[in-house]
Amino acid sequence: MVALDNLTFIAVNFKALYKFLQGMEWNPNCLQRSVQGVLSVLLSLKKNPIIRYQNFSSLARRLAENIRDTILKESSLFHFHRGESIPLLLILDRRCDPITPLLNQWTYQAMVHELLSIKNNRVSLVGVPGAPKDMSEVLLSAEQDEFYANNMYLNFGDIGQTIKSLMDEFQMKAKSHQKVESIADMKAFVENYPQFKKMSGAVTKHVTLVGELSRLVTQHNLLEVSEAEQELACQEEHTQSLTKIRRLLVTDQIRDLDAARLVFLYAIRYHKHQSKDIVGLVDLLRRRGTPVRLIDCVEGILRYASSGETAGSSILTTNDVTKITEKIFKVRATQLMI
């Protein structure tokens, strides 16, 4: 594992993660590497945590037991003072909720990852309409960008309002810098110029990023796609959902990835429904030219979700969250104006 920032760690070898199961049991080598990865994070953070895991999952239990045994065996390495707040290592089995990873994300950081992609804390703006010519790539790091650190978890609507406030503040400071009439004014300008220039760059960067996110949301019809996803995850309207998915799959506006995700969600949600039409939806994916690698995932995702169905069934009958979705998008019109 490597650290992206002080809150985020990722596995280096992603392909290995897909091979850790042998008939829904741990591959011994992958179990060992997973234990080593978690332990390396604990050591880097200087934490000796209490370990909790989901009771239904034998996979989570084995991982927890191996981590505990190693910590006890190497107790001298984990002799850290716990303090008043005891750290907790919580091990969850993704099978209890196969829905959430398939949903489109609507927070600032997640949308940049999903729609623009971040590599080594850098976002490429090559080909982005309206992007400044000298801004082909921007740095997006919580450690070096105060605005990003404070707003990375805001939803799409709120981030638009926040950037508008940043712009208003910048415009006020820009006006004050226009009045350089005395030696004192010149001195103040020189002293504040680095901060002013930094703020100018931050405004330009984030306005450009959010503007591009807004364009992509419209281009790929992500609002309607996300609404269909929420209905699949949280409502009991099979006919309504099936009709909406069929309509979306025959449009060219949505991405192949979003089309496939809708079918994945439908398959997980309604694979036991007497009127299910998974085969028909898969056929629509083929007709629209969806890559075979995505189509082939339908069966695998169903098998994966079914293996944890007993624990995860309650996830699929959550109360309606349409109001939450509406809240996320409520200020989109304002955001598009910045």
Give the ranges of each region predicted by the language model.
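Extended, well-folded catalytic/binding cores that form a central cleft or groove in large enzyme
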Residues: 1-338
